[in-house]
Amino acid sequence: MGQKVNPISFRLVRTRDWRSKWFANKKEFGDLLVEDQIIRAYLLKKPALVGVSAIKIKRMSGKVEVTIVTARPGLVIGKKGAEIDVLKGELSKLTGKEVWVAVEEVKRPDMDAKIVADSIAKQLERRIPFRRAMKKAMQSSIDAGAFGIKVQLSGRIGGAEIARTEWYKEGSTPLHTLRADIDYATGRAETTYGSIGVKVWIYRGEDNLAKKEA
């Protein structure tokens, strides 16, 4: 079963946390869910938001708190927080609510699956050979302290006439083990031959809670 489900949702509460934290009744739930998607899509289109791992959203008494998790916080914050103020204004106008924006830094970007997946996708768009892009990303993750990594590409890889799937793996990625801290993310490269999907699994060790319980 661990092979079939999303590794993040499979480990919610155990080693992972929700990216949206709020409660709503049946009437409001759908609207707020769509609003979360609109906020994330709007932010990810921003050129300044480079190396974004996740966008967390909290709601409380009519206010929205958006936390941008990124490897390059300086670009998001801007000079003297100018970019943050701009984002607050734009998101408030978009949602019609008071919005707070915070920035959280990714300490080890080479061990973050989303950042690694987006990095591989950008290299493919620049026509860097796919095997080189995959192996370079994997080696960087292992050097950063990852216990294992798996990278999968799907599509017309290298401009091939027939779409196929290629994957490489180094170390272990125990998807069935709930106490294993597995980071998983997807990316997409828009090449002249079409879209190429990127999937990345990174095993970062066992969570501290599991070790204490053992």
Swiss-Prot record:
* Xref: PROSITE patterns: KH_TYPE_2, RIBOSOMAL_S3
Q: What GO cellular-component annotations does this UniProt entry give? A: cytosolic small ribosomal subunit
Its name, as the record gives it, is Small ribosomal subunit protein uS3
Database matches in PANTHER family = 30S/40S RIBOSOMAL PROTEIN S3, SMALL RIBOSOMAL SUBUNIT PROTEIN US3C
Q: Which GO terms describe its molecular function?
A: mRNA binding; rRNA binding; structural constituent of ribosome
CDD domains, A to Z: KH-II_30S_S3
Description of how the protein assembles with itself and partners: Part of the 30S ribosomal subunit. Forms a tight complex with proteins S10 and S14.
Q: Please describe what this protein does.
A: Binds the lower part of the 30S subunit head. Binds mRNA in the 70S ribosome, positioning it for translation.
GO BP field: translation
Keywords, comma-separated and alphabetical? Ribonucleoprotein, Ribosomal protein, RNA-binding, rRNA-binding
Provide the gene name from the record: rpsC
Repeat is among the record's keywords? no
Name the family. Answer: Belongs to the universal ribosomal protein uS3 family.
Which Pfam families does the UniProt entry name for this protein? KH_2, Ribosomal_S3_C
Matching InterPro entries: KH_dom, KH_dom-like_a/b, KH_dom_type_2, KH_sf_prok-type, Ribosomal_S3_C_sf, Ribosomal_uS3_bac-typ, Ribosomal_uS3_C, Ribosomal_uS3_CS
Q: What is the scientific name of the source organism?
A: Protochlamydia amoebophila (strain UWE25)
Record-linked NCBIfam families:
rpsC_bact
Q: Which residues form a coiled coil?
A: none
Q: Show where the KH type-2 domain sits.
A: 39-107
